[in-house]
């Protein structure tokens, strides 16, 4: 499936997710971008019945491990846990995978990395916003979440919410910064109360109602221009930061027992923190102190393996400024896999 997901002039389009809606697809195929099967059996059946519609599989993210009884780094353990859960569910005929139900944003990012380790299929991810200011339940800014996901292989983000106002606000906040396809999961009775900014895909609750609304031009859609292309989006994992390539970066900060204090001390002196990884224990310390990181983060390590471990546990996008120079092929891989930003 190409990016963006919707290639039709009939936008937004629907993801078929109900067997009862299959006759609607045959009647109005232009209204559908794809189909979302709940299991491999239906994925097989729909792949044959709905040709040429791409059919994907839904994958529920597992619960996060208990921090008190889990080996460190916890993120590494969770990535392996996701692989164990996802591996038997993967299917040759699935055109894409739809990740949903992640308990936190760092968990969703880890699930995306796990799926990327297992296969190279298109990934769609769901983000649930908790308020009308575009925050996820763990407080993550929706712009930060999208900024990370669009650089680690996710091609479409579907936003859900408790109410139409929160959904509208989240779309309006995210649309200027999104460089991937935006979609929504929504109820039909929200149609008159929701404005769909830059929305290409809808996962409906009642497919028939949405087909009728789209046919009758009863869906309020608006386009917002992309903004801030002159700046780099460098989320710390929770907050969105927009930086210039010439951002002031701190001196190297060791990930030792006083990392929290060192981060507080460096907070007013630079635009980004540069953390040095020298041992695997430093990676554990980095993970434990990530909630103290309120600036864009630059990682450096003499060992490419250590640098990769750091990239796996950091929920945001790490900067690379050339300290402890790595091979170009290695940095290119880190850019693709983890969204590392080469300055």
Tell where the protein language model's regions lie, with residue ranges:
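Domain-level signal for soluble alpha/beta catalytic cores
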Residues: 1-343
């Amino acid at each position: 499936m190409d990016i963006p997901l919707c290639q039709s002039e009939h936008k937004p389009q629907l993801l078929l997710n109900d067997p009862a809606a299959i006759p609607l697809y045959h009647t109005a195929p232009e209204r559908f971008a794809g189909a979302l099967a709940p299991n491999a059996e239906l994925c097989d059946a729909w792949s044959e019945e709905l040709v040429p519609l791409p059919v994907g599989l839904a994958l529920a993210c597992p619960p996060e491990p208990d921090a008190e009884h889990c080996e460190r780094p916890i993120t590494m353990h969770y990535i392996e846990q996701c692989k164990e859960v996802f591996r038997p569910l993967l299917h040759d005929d699935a055109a894409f995978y739809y990740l949903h139900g992640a308990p936190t944003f760092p968990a969703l990012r880890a699930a995306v990395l796990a799926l990327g380790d297992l296969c190279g299929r298109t990934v769609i991810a769901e983000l649930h916003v908790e308020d009308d200011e575009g925050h996820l339940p763990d407080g993550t800014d929706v712009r930060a979440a999208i900024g990370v996901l669009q650089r680690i292989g996710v091609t479409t983000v579907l936003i859900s919410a408790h109410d139409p106002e929160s959904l509208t606000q989240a779309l309006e906040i995210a649309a200027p910064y999104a460089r991937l396809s935006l979609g929504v999961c929504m109820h039909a009775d929200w149609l008159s109360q929701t404005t769909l900014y830059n929305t290409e895909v809808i996962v409906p609750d009642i497919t028939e109602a949405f087909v009728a609304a789209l046919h009758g031009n009863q869906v309020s859609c608006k386009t917002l221009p992309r903004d801030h292309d002159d700046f780099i989006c460098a989320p710390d994992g929770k907050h969105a930061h927009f930086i210039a390539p010439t951002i002031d970066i701190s001196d190297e900060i060791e990930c030792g027992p006083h990392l929290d204090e060192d981060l507080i001390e460096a907070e007013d002196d630079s635009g980004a923190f540069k953390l040095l990884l020298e041992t695997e224990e430093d990676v554990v310390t980095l993970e434990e102190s990530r909630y103290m990181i309120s600036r864009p983060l630059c990682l450096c390590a003499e060992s490419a393996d250590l640098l990769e471990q750091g990239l796996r546990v950091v929920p945001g996008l790490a900067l690379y400024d050339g300290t402890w120079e790595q091979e170009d092929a290695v940095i290119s891989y880190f850019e693709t896999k983890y969204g590392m930003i080469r300055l």
